[in-house]
């Protein structure tokens, strides 16, 4: 899925002609849902590409094994919530007062841009790389073997339960709690 900042809303799907009838798009509780219909087993020869145009990003999520790529920078006035459940991958450039990034599973998330406060959590083996997302304050928690990298110029509050590692840059003051073999380290 490709996200593009635009004045209006639009969804475009590129797929093999015989697969398009089995793809559902609908809005549920203010969220755009794109998925295959229930009880359908798809065997496609090429990837399905979904391009979504929207004026502002409030949240984005993957359940399963999809990819989300922001083709433009997204600016928000409130918190932006980003979540991967499964093995998906997300790459976004965001600018908002607060960002929440969460992975459950083995997904990968790459974030850049600017924020005041970021909260990151990884449960499982997922990786969050927010080293290019300039933040003042970071609250970071890894449970399992997932690794998280952040930039924080004021504070880093790190919690590890397991073997995951937390790395940080930006010079923020660090407080950490470690239960397991993981580590908290400053990097350049």
Where are these regions (language model features)?
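Solvent-exposed adhesion/ligand-recognition segments of exported proteins
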Residues: 15, 22-27
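Extended, compositionally simple hydrophobic/Ser/Thr-rich segments
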Residues: 1-2, 42, 50-52, 57-188
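Short, ordered beta-strand-loop transition motifs
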Residues: 4-6, 26-30
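Start-of-domain marker
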Residues: 1-12
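Short carbohydrate-recognition loop motifs
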Residues: 29-37
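Short, surface-exposed polybasic-and-hydrophobic patches located at secondary-structure transitions
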Residues: 11-14, 76-77
């Amino acid at each position: 899925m490709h996200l593009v900042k635009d004045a209006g809303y639009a969804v475009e799907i590129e797929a093999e002609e015989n697969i398009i009838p089995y793809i559902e798009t609908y809005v549920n509780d203010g969220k755009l849902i794109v998925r295959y219909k229930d009880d359908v087993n798809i065997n496609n020869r090429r990837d399905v590409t979904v391009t979504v145009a929207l004026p502002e990003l409030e949240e984005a999520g993957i359940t399963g094994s999809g990819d989300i790529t922001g083709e433009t920078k997204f600016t928000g006035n409130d918190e932006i919530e980003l979540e991967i459940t499964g093995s998906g991958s997300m790459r976004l450039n965001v600018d908002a007062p607060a960002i929440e990034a969460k992975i459950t599973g083995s997904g990968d998330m790459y974030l850049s841009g600017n924020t005041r406060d970021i909260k990151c959590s990884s449960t499982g083996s997922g990786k969050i790389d927010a080293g290019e997302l300039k933040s003042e304050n970071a609250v970071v928690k890894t449970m399992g073997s997932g690794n998280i990298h952040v930039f924080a110029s004021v504070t880093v509050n790190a919690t590890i339960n397991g073997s995951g590692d937390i790395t940080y840059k930006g010079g923020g003051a660090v407080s950490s709690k470690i239960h397991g073999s993981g580590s908290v380290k400053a990097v350049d």
